[in-house]
Design a protein with these regions (language model features):
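Helix-coil boundary and N-terminal low-complexity module in membrane systems
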Residues: 1-116, 124-229
């Protein structure tokens, strides 16, 4: 994967070849993500490492090396197993509930179907923010990412709504496009989540609780402290 830190043309726009290269990089990312997630239990690790790669790309203009990515994936597999199982269980229960309501097999009718669909969309938006946050901490610290994302969703509901829209659009496109294109869509979706999250920063109160790094204190998360004027 190439660097995106190329010069722009005289009109202030990037050259179309650079844009095409970025699109190809994201498509490759989606394909690799899908292959790594194929065993199911490695799905969370694959998503987290892909998010970490996009995080590096958007911050530095370069993709992480294959060695660094494989090292991240190896560290993220075991912590990601319960996350993969939980995500699969929640998705399965919501899908079964929506199917039963749509078919009229359970009481509630259209109102219950609409409420359940809204709950599912909201959870998908929250999951999208968790994916963005876990990418910022190396791709494997899901518990810290989940706590921070919950605070961010409550304190910045517009960003939560925006991320919900991204996940809903991605889900719709996944249904409409040919199955072969779904892995490519996965890479674009991760990039879109990062783009929307970076353009709608959380409120200062949430940012002050965000974990900064795990490189000190024996690998435990260190939280940023609000600046004192």
């Amino acid at each position: 994967m190439a660097s995106r830190a190329e010069p722009v043309d005289t009109g202030g726009r990037r050259d179309w070849r650079d844009v095409a290269r970025d699109a190809a990089d994201l498509a490759l990312l989606g394909i690799l993500l899908t292959l790594a997630a194929a065993p199911v239990l490695t799905a969370a690790a694959a998503v987290g490492v892909a998010s970490a790669a996009v995080h590096d790309w958007t911050r530095t203009g370069s993709w992480p090396s294959a060695r660094a990515t494989l090292r991240r994936f190896g560290r993220a597999v075991l912590p990601g197993v319960p996350v993969s199982l939980l995500a699969l269980a929640v998705a399965g229960l919501l899908a079964a509930d929506l199917a039963a309501l749509a078919a009229g097999r359970v009481p509630g009718g259209p109102p219950a179907l609409a409420v359940t669909a809204l709950v599912a969309a909201g959870l998908a938006g929250y999951a999208g923010l968790v994916v963005v946050e876990v990418g910022g901490n190396g791709g494997g610290r899901w518990r810290v990412a989940a706590r921070w994302a919950a605070c961010a969703c409550l304190d910045a509901p517009t960003r939560w709504a925006a991320l919900t829209g991204v996940t809903a659009l991605a889900g719709l496109l996944a249904v409409l496009v040919t199955p072969v294109a779904v892995p490519i869509l996965a890479g674009y979706t991760v990039a879109a989540l990062h783009a929307v999250a970076s353009r709608r920063p959380a409120l200062a109160g949430v940012a002050s609780r965000r974990p900064v790094s795990a490189g000190v204190a024996g690998g435990r998360p260190v939280y940023a402290q609000p600046e004192v004027p």
